[in-house]
Structures are given as structure tokens and as C-alpha cells.
């Protein structure tokens, strides 16, 4: 039942492993499952051939990742020029935000399987006063920006937002974020953003 599912940890959440360029199914699985089953995991694929967009499309409270290979076939030795630094960088990015998947989930866009859609969601930790916004722009989208109305924020509080990719920070009030929304600009196709936020503490 739903109560049991909410306490389960499915290490492999579906028989359909989405390793397509757009990762539409992986995004849709996460969007749907986080409403009911907060702890789950799927595969991002092999770390020598995935992008940040692929990684972020597959992120959840758990993540399965391989170094290299070809399914169940016998595997050749890992080559000496394997991009270990790149693989480590991707894994460290995921580990740096994994804790937010134990927070409250809020979808910021509609559910869609369209190749030209954006999907975004918010993970909020009310006890800590912080959270994470995950934004995914699919390959077919011609749009370069979106305004996302955030949830569960105090209108009277100022929040600091840090873009993981650019390092740019900005401060906005909860009132601005829940009415006008958070502006996100993504120029590439596909593209993605990870944006951390925290309530500003008064000194």
C-alpha cells in the first residue's frame, strides 16, 4: 500500500532503464515517484559517456552509476586514459545535493513527455531552511528562460540562491519567489541547472 511504499527503498525503481539522449522517461519517473516514494534510484549510465544533463535527469535519493562497459557482456579492462577526474566530478556533484532528496518535494512544472518541454522541481528542507531547485530543459525546447514559482517559502524571509554551474549568487524574498518566480536561463539544448537556496540568517 502507499504507506509501505513511502517507507521502502526501491534500489531499481523500474524495468525500463532510460539511457536515451533526452532522458524523458527518467525525468518523468522521478517527477511521478517523488510524490509517493521519496526513496528510489535508477541508473545514469556509464560515467565516461554521460553529461551533467544526463546525471541530473537521473538523480534521486539513490543513483546507480557504472564506470564503463556493455551490459552483461564480458568487460575489457578500463583504459589507462579513462576520464576518472570527470567521473569523480559528476559523482561529487550528486553527493553534494543528495541530502535534499530527503526533503519535501514540490513539482514546479506540469508533467510532460514532450521532447520540447522543461521539467523542474523543488526539494525543500523546512527544518534547515534550505533547499534545491532542479531544472531540466529537453533537447527540443526552443526557449531560453523560465520563471518558476517556488513553494513553501516564507514571504517575509530573504533567501540566498547559488547557481551550482555559474557560481552566481542572488538574494530574493519569499514574496518575490512565490509570485513572480525564480528566473532561470538555459541557452543550450538540452540543458540543466542546479540551484541551491537557504534562508538568510539575521546576525
Report each predicted region and the residues it spans:
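A glycine-rich phosphate-binding loop feature that marks nucleotide/adenosyl-phosphate handling sites
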Residues: 1-2, 107-116
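Extended hydrophobic-aromatic, low-complexity segments
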Residues: 67-68, 142-146, 171
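Carbohydrate-binding surface patches
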Residues: 112-155, 194
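Conserved, mostly hydrophobic/aromatic
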Residues: 58, 133, 161
Amino acid at each position: 500500500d502507499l504507506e509501505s511504499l513511502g517507507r521502502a527503498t526501491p534500489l531499481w525503481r523500474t524495468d525500463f532503464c532510460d539511457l536515451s539522449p533526452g532522458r524523458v522517461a527518467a525525468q518523468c519517473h522521478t517527477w511521478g515517484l517523488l510524490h509517493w516514494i521519496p526513496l528510489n534510484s535508477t541508473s545514469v549510465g556509464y560515467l565516461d559517456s554521460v553529461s551533467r544533463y544526463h546525471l541530473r535527469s537521473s538523480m534521486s535519493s539513490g543513483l546507480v552509476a557504472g564506470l564503463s562497459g556493455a551490459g552483461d557482456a564480458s568487460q575489457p579492462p578500463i583504459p589507462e586514459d579513462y576520464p576518472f577526474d570527470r567521473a569523480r566530478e559528476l559523482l561529487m556533484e550528486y553527493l553534494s545535493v543528495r541530502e535534499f532528496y530527503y526533503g519535501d518535494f514540490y513539482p514546479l512544472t506540469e508533467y510532460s513527455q514532450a521532447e520540447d518541454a522543461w521539467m523542474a522541481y523543488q526539494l525543500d528542507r523546512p527544518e534547515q531552511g534550505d533547499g534545491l531547485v532542479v531544472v531540466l530543459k529537453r533537447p527540443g525546447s526552443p526557449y531560453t528562460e523560465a520563471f518558476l514559482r517556488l513553494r513553501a517559502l516564507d514571504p517575509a524571509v530573504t533567501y540566498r540562491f547559488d547557481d551550482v554551474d555559474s557560481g552566481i549568487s542572488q538574494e530574493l524574498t519569499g514574496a518575490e519567489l512565490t509570485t513572480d518566480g525564480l528566473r532561470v536561463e538555459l541557452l543550450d539544448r538540452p540543458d540543466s541547472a542546479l540551484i541551491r537556496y537557504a534562508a538568510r540568517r539575521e546576525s
